[in-house]
Amino acid sequence: EFMEYKHGYGPEMITGLAKIDGLLVGVVANYQGMLMNYPEYKMATYGQAMGVGGKLYRQGLIKMNEFVTLCARDRIPMLWVQDTTGIDVGNDAERAELLGLGQSLIYSIQSSKLPMMEITLRRGTAAAHYVLGGPQGNDNNAFSLGTAATEINVMNGKTAANAMYTGRLAKD
């Protein structure tokens, strides 16, 4: 059984209550695929937008924060399932205050004192890995699981190479 919380809001995230072997659990998972006319803060600026599943945006961070708070209120343990490439970046993302929303979510997770479990299916990248129940940002995490294909990193290789060598390549 699964009862979704705020369907349609923050469509990159699926949140809801599930019964697993008779035990009620809060489930948070990210959606893979294209998200038409989303995120809303890019729609307001450009009149069109296309979000990418696996990336976190404003509404999804707000939705997760509210859901963690509700689970904490009712002492419902949580299961996090992630396959993420990170939190949206750029000027629009900064104006949408994504960093602050991520910090608020980590605070909610830490103060909830709920038992949690996290599963990384393919990728757990950067701050998105932490806010999706990753053990680095979660003292309540009982354990984390991965698959043979799981990659967890602070920054993907291409981004790291660009950050390290862009200035040097421009000089040469």
Regions found by a protein language model. Name each.
Residues 1-172:
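Ligand-binding clefts of soluble mixed alpha/beta catalytic domains
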